[in-house]
Amino acid sequence: MLLAKGGGIVDIPSNHSVDQTVEKLRAILEANGVSLFALVDHSGEAEKVGMKMRPTKLLIFGSPSAGTPLMLAAPSLALDLPLKVLIREDDNGRVWVSYNSPDYLKERHGLP
């Protein structure tokens, strides 16, 4: 089920842990020739400064062959590329996969 929130965010529930979901997405990206540029462990970084945060990780990924033509058409799109997917656990222990809606990005950057 896709849940669109205000601001163009799409939330999809995951039946797996944050780490399992990250690994599944990494495998999908790799199988499709998409580069994973970074994996940000927000909860791990919070722990380093003595703060507690539920498991929260951000994947930053993309494909120059797909993204470059879009940025040539709408240079402001570089603000939102490479793409990002947030995987987090909520206060109830439910894991969510969140990303910016493609329709939101199209509208935001004036793409046809």
Placement of each model-derived feature along the sequence:
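A short, structured loop/turn motif at beta-sheet edges
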Residues: 88-95
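Small-molecule pocket liners
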Residues: 8, 57, 95
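Short, compositionally biased low-complexity segments
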Residues: 1-2, 96-98
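Well-ordered alpha/beta subsegment
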Residues: 107-112
